[in-house]
UniProtKB/Swiss-Prot annotation:
Name this polypeptide is given: Hemoglobin subunit beta
Subunit structure: Heterotetramer of two alpha chains and two beta chains.
A UniProt-annotated Pfam family: Globin
A cellular component annotation (GO) from this entry: blood microparticle
Signal peptide: none
Length: 147
C-alpha cells in the first residue's frame, strides 16, 4: 500500500495521463539495461544488447518496456492493494525468472529519471516525491513473494 495525500495522488494521476507508455517504457527498460548492465542477463533472448545504442534501439527491449509500464499503469489504478495487483508478477519473477528484487527498485528509480527527462519543469520536486513513493511501493509489492 502506498500512502499518498490527495494532492500527491492527483499529481501522479495527472502526469501519468500524459505519459506515452511505449516511449517511456522502452526508454526506462533500455536505460536500466545500459546503466546496470548485469540486468541484461535476464534478457539474453532479446538479441543484440552489445552497446548502449543497440540496447536503446532494440525492438524487443522497447516492446517489453511497454509491457512493464502497462503493468505499472495497473498498479496506479490499485495503489491501495499493490501486493494483490502484483502477486502473479512477483511469483513469476521470484520462482521462475529468479530476478534479484533489487532490480525492481533500480527500474523504479530509472523510471523516475525518464519521467523527469520527458516532463522537465512539470516534474516538480513534489511530483518526484510522489512518484518515488509509488515506485517504492511497486518494488515492494513485486518483491513480496521473495523469501
Amino acid at each position: 500500500m502506498v500512502h499518498l495525500t490527495g494532492e500527491e495522488k492527483a499529481a501522479v494521476t495527472a502526469l501519468w495521463g500524459k505519459v506515452n507508455v511505449x516511449e517511456v517504457g522502452g526508454e526506462a527498460l533500455g536505460r536500466l539495461l545500459v546503466v546496470y548492465p548485469w540486468t541484461q542477463r535476464f534478457f539474453e533472448s532479446f538479441g543484440d544488447l552489445s552497446s548502449p545504442d543497440a540496447v536503446m534501439s532494440n525492438x524487443k527491449v522497447k516492446a517489453h518496456g511497454k509491457k512493464v509500464l502497462g503493468a505499472f499503469s495497473d498498479g496506479l489504478a490499485h495503489l491501495d492493494n499493490l501486493k494483490s495487483t502484483f502477486a502473479q508478477l512477483s511469483e513469476l519473477h521470484c520462482d521462475k525468472l529468479h530476478v534479484d528484487p533489487e532490480n525492481f527498485r533500480l527500474l523504479g528509480n530509472v523510471l523516475v529519471c525518464v519521467l523527469a527527462h520527458h516532463f522537465g519543469k512539470e516534474f516538480t520536486p513534489q511530483v518526484q516525491a510522489a512518484y518515488q513513493k509509488v515506485v517504492a511501493g511497486v518494488a515492494n509489492a513485486l518483491a513480496h513473494k521473495y523469501h
